[in-house]
């Protein structure tokens, strides 16, 4: 169980200024949270496989397919620089890297 002195110490470490009423309130709330965690700790999970998610997640991305765009020239013409059918952008990496 957590007491008001521990709440006061943690508040000081976190640079929080709590009133005595807030310290009492947080002591009660944190005590309830810790009691609940203790109940969870008592559960038998020996037959439960470790997981990072409660439900399975599958990859829902679509295939990367080429989709022609009718106004390609207008997009290329709006670029500051182009080289053939491509945008020309400034080099950002050194050749040493």
Curated annotation (Swiss-Prot):
Gene Ontology terms: biological process: glutaminyl-tRNAGln biosynthesis via transamidation; regulation of translational fidelity; translation
Statement: the UniProt record of this protein carries the keyword Translocase: no
GO terms for MF: asparaginyl-tRNA synthase (glutamine-hydrolyzing) activity; ATP binding; glutaminyl-tRNA synthase (glutamine-hydrolyzing) activity
Known catalytic reactions: L-glutamyl-tRNA(Gln) + L-glutamine + ATP + H2O = L-glutaminyl-tRNA(Gln) + L-glutamate + ADP + phosphate + H(+); L-aspartyl-tRNA(Asn) + L-glutamine + ATP + H2O = L-asparaginyl-tRNA(Asn) + L-glutamate + ADP + phosphate + 2 H(+)
InterPro entries referenced in this protein's UniProt entry, alphabetically: Asp/Glu-ADT_sf_sub_c (IPR036113), GatC (IPR003837)
Record's keyword terms, sorted: ATP-binding, Ligase, Nucleotide-binding, Protein biosynthesis
Entries under Gene3D superfamilies matching the protein: Glu-tRNAGln amidotransferase C subunit, N-terminal domain
Enzyme Commission code(s) on record: 6.3.5.-
Keyword match Cell inner membrane: no
HAMAP family per record: GatC
Family membership noted in the UniProt record: Belongs to the GatC family.
Protein function: Allows the formation of correctly charged Asn-tRNA(Asn) or Gln-tRNA(Gln) through the transamidation of misacylated Asp-tRNA(Asn) or Glu-tRNA(Gln) in organisms which lack either or both of asparaginyl-tRNA or glutaminyl-tRNA synthetases. The reaction takes place in the presence of glutamine and ATP through an activated phospho-Asp-tRNA(Asn) or phospho-Glu-tRNA(Gln).
Binding partners and assembly: Heterotrimer of A, B and C subunits.
Protein name: Aspartyl/glutamyl-tRNA(Asn/Gln) amidotransferase subunit C
Taxonomy of the source species: Bacteria, Bacillati, Cyanobacteriota, Cyanophyceae, Nostocales
């Amino acid at each position: 169980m957590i007491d008001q002195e521990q709440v006061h110490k943690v508040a000081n470490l976190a640079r929080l200024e709590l009133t005595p009423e807030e310290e009492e309130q947080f002591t009660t709330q944190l005590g309830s949270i810790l009691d609940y965690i203790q109940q969870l700790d008592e559960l038998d999970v020996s037959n439960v496989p470790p997981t990072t998610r409660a439900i399975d997640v599958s990859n829902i991305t679509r295939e990367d397919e080429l989709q022609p765009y009718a106004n390609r020239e207008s997009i290329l013409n709006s670029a500051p620089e182009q080289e053939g059918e491509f945008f020309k952008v400034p080099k950002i990496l050194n050749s040493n890297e």
